[in-house]
């Protein structure tokens, strides 16, 4: 009897990570969903992650805690920094959380080693992204190289692969792909400042990208807006 293929899927509760989970499942993996409470402004996305993990049949869903909010430095972790509502203005925005994807992928890598999983999925995107340096293909390639140098599995020849299947897709393309795979986007939360019920502000950069994506995809937007 062959061992099941296992993959760790980073699951924020947003549109992209939900699509990523559906893609990993469709690729035949037993999916172990990992959400991170890092000190973000709201917990609505973590509640969304629980819903998505259940509806997309994750084998297990874990919530890890790391206190990036202790350091601040981002509008998503420091309530004294306002979330921009004027749209993207160029450069690295204040919604960038320093080292967030590096930290999250490192935690995913630790769980992967424990489970004997050699595949990690992350929903980063370099097309409709907001200027985050840790959403670029170069970052993913560099982290994968590090993972294969820094782990027992890598040293023993079991190659670790970081999958970023959305990295070249537009937001519309992501939505179309996820819809075809049965993702219920009404369960997801993308807004940077959603209320505790998960209702979106409709004006932050994440909301703008989400709205435009559904419109371009020709699919009704199920997002509840305040």
From Swiss-Prot:
What is its pathway? Purine metabolism; 7-cyano-7-deazaguanine biosynthesis
Can you state which reaction this protein catalyses? 7-carboxy-7-deazaguanine + NH4(+) + ATP = 7-cyano-7-deazaguanine + ADP + phosphate + H2O + H(+)
Q: Which Gene3D superfamilies match?
A: HUPs
Cofactor notes: Binds 1 zinc ion per subunit.
Annotated binding of ATP, by residue: 11-21
The enzyme class is ligase
Could you provide one GO biological process annotation from this protein's UniProt record?
Answer: queuosine biosynthetic process
Name the residues that bind Zn(2+).
191, 201, 204, 207
**Which GO terms fall under molecular function for this chain's record?**
ATP binding; ligase activity, forming carbon-nitrogen bonds; zinc ion binding
Pfam families tied to this protein: QueC (PF06508)
- Alphabetic keyword roster: ATP-binding, Ligase, Metal-binding, Nucleotide-binding, Queuosine biosynthesis, Zinc
> Recorded E.C. number(s)?
6.3.4.20
Q: Which domain of life is it from?
A: Bacteria
- Which cofactor is recorded for it? Zn(2+)
Checking InterPro entries in the record gives: QueC, Rossmann-like_a/b/a_fold
**Family (UniProt):** Belongs to the QueC family.
What NCBIfam families does UniProt report for this protein, alphabetically?
A: 7-cyano-7-deazaguanine synthase QueC (TIGR00364)
Annotated function: Catalyzes the ATP-dependent conversion of 7-carboxy-7-deazaguanine (CDG) to 7-cyano-7-deazaguanine (preQ(0)).
Q: What is this protein called?
A: 7-cyano-7-deazaguanine synthase
């Amino acid at each position: 009897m062959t061992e099941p293929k296992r993959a760790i899927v980073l699951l924020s509760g947003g549109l992209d990570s939900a699509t990523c989970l559906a893609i990993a499942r469709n690729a035949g993996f037993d999916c172990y969903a990992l959400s991170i409470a890092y000190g973000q402004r709201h917990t609505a996305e973590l509640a969304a992650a629980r819903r998505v993990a259940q509806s997309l049949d994750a084998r297990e869903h874990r919530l890890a805690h790391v206190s990036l909010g202790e350091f601040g430095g981002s509008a998503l972790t420091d309530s004294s920094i306002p979330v921009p509502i004027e749209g993207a203005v160029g450069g690295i925005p204040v919604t960038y959380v320093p080292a967030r994807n590096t930290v999250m992928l490192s935690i995913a890598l630790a769980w992967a080693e424990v489970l004997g999983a050699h595949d990690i999925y992350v929903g980063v995107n370099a097309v409709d992204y907001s200027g985050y340096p840790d959403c670029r293909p170069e970052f993913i390639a560099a982290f994968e190289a590090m993972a294969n140098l820094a782990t027992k599995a890598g040293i023993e020849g079991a190659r670790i692969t970081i999958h970023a299947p959305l990295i070249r897709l537009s937001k519309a393309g992501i939505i179309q792909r996820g819809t075809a795979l049965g993702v219920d986007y009404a369960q997801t939360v993308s807004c940077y400042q959603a209320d505790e019920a998960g209702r979106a502000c409709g004006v932050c950069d994440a909301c703008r990208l989400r709205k435009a994506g559904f419109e371009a995809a020709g699919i009704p937007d199920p997002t509840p807006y305040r």
